[in-house]
Each structure stands twice: as structure tokens, then as C-alpha cells.
């Protein structure tokens, strides 16, 4: 089949980029992963991802690009359930992973069984930020319910970190003399 010079030029313009992309793609093996995570891990993964990419390259010979999506853990879980194509999910609570497993089937329902004691591989540290000089003398959970003290924390319905805050406050109340479910409920309600 003969093509006019104009058609040949048009075909060259259309096919050249496609062919070049195919050759470049095969020459540069690359994997891209999306890690859907919760807000406090942003800086952790900014430091971790380049080191993991080096390890991946050494193990596989492939370049690795890791993309991040951060937000409240509950909202991130909902996004995955609603179709966000995550390759890795690193959320604050097992509850969020369970919801993804139950509603999408993309994670085995018994995912925790692969770890000792059905563990979730995360910990969390609660930190109290106070005004300069700590004028109200806040040192422990009990200080947070003193008159004049206000607590600012994210919503536990959408934030895994806030759920840890809630659970830590509950645990504190349980460990107080006479602590039980009722006193813990009263404490977190007052808080």
C-alpha cells in the first residue's frame, strides 16, 4: 500500500511516540505502588520509601516508584472500599483493615493470623502538646479534665489516631483505683 508524503508524515507523528514508549517501557522496568496510609505516617514514608526503593532495586533489578495517599484512617479505608486502587494499605487500626477485608474481599478476612498473637504491626504514642511553660501543669490524662483545660483531638469516627487517643484515655481510666467499664465511660465522656 502506498501512502502520500502527507499521510506518511502523519503516520510517523502518530506511531513514533507509541513505538518509542513501548521500547522505553521495556528498557526501563519499573513498578509503581500506591500506599494508602493515615496522616501521621506522611513523614515516616517520605524517609522510608527511598530506602525501600533501593532495596527493591537490589532485589529485583526494577525501579520502584511509591505514591502516597494520606488522610484520616477511617476516610482512607472508605476510599479503598469505594474503589481507590491501593497496592499497600497502612492504616492506624485493625478495624479499618477488617472493614476493607469484609467489604472488598481484597484482603483475607483472617489477615492477622499471619502474625504472632493476631497482631497488627503498628504502635502509637500519644503526646500532649501544651502551651509554652505548661501553665496548667498538664502531665497525665487526669489533668485533661481539670476545669479550664480544653482538649483538641480529631474525630475518632474518621481518624485512627483519634481512636488511639480514645482507647488510651479509656485504658488510663481503667487503671485508676476502682477503675472499671463504667468509670472509664464516665472519664472519656467528661474528657
Which residues does each PLM region occupy?
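Bacterial N-terminal signal peptides that target proteins for export
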Residues: 2-17
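Local alpha-helix boundary/kink/capping signal
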Residues: 18, 22-23, 46
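Sec/Tat signal peptide C-region and signal peptidase I cleavage site
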Residues: 23-29
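N-terminal segment of the mature folded domain
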Residues: 30-159, 177
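Active-site cradle of extracellular carbohydrate-active enzymes
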Residues: 161-166
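Helix-loop "lid/cap" segments that line or gate small-molecule binding pockets
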Residues: 168-175
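Ligand-binding pocket segment of bilobal, Venus flytrap-like solute-binding proteins
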Residues: 176-191
Amino acid at each position: 500500500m502506498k501512502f502520500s508524503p502527507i499521510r506518511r508524515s502523519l503516520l510517523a507523528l502518530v506511531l513514533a511516540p507509541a513505538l518509542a514508549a513501548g521500547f522505553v517501557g521495556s528498557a526501563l522496568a519499573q513498578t509503581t505502588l500506591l500506599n494508602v496510609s493515615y496522616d501521621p505516617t506522611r513523614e515516616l514514608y517520605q524517609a522510608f520509601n527511598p530506602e525501600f526503593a533501593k532495596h527493591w532495586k537490589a532485589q529485583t533489578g526494577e525501579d520502584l516508584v511509591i505514591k502516597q495517599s494520606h488522610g484520616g484512617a477511617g476516610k482512607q479505608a472508605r476510599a479503598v472500599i469505594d474503589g481507590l486502587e491501593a497496592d499497600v494499605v497502612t492504616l492506624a487500626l485493625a478495624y479499618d483493615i477488617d472493614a476493607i477485608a469484609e467489604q472488598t474481599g481484597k484482603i483475607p478476612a483472617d489477615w492477622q493470623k499471619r502474625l504472632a498473637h493476631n497482631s497488627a504491626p503498628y504502635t502509637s504514642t500519644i503526646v500532649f502538646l501544651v502551651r509554652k511553660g505548661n501553665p496548667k501543669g498538664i502531665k497525665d490524662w487526669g489533668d485533661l479534665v481539670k476545669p479550664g483545660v480544653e482538649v483538641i483531638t480529631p474525630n475518632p469516627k474518621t481518624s485512627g489516631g483519634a481512636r488511639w487517643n480514645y482507647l488510651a484515655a479509656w485504658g488510663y481510666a481503667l487503671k485508676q483505683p476502682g477503675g472499671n467499664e463504667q468509670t472509664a465511660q464516665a472519664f472519656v465522656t467528661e474528657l
